[in-house]
């Protein structure tokens, strides 16, 4: 199966109403590549990915946000290790898992 491997810069943002969740929005061109992947349906239209932010690397999923973009949850342990939080602009590497 063809995959996606990209790097991009994004601002971290905190979900409204839930201070625990922090996300990065994938750029439209990267999101379009994820939307076009041939894959079996996953929960909530999610796509399994491996992510790099600074010296941290982890596996997670990206989720569609409306019809134009995917969002990436950035867990607290990663934000703490990298010294970043909502409002910071970060460089992210992302690739489809498996």
Annotate each PLM feature.
Residues 1-69, 86-89, 93-95:
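Long, compositionally biased stretches
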Residues 72:
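Beta-strand/loop nucleic-acid-binding surfaces
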Residues 98:
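Conserved GTPase G-domain substructure that encodes guanine base recognition and part of the catalytic core
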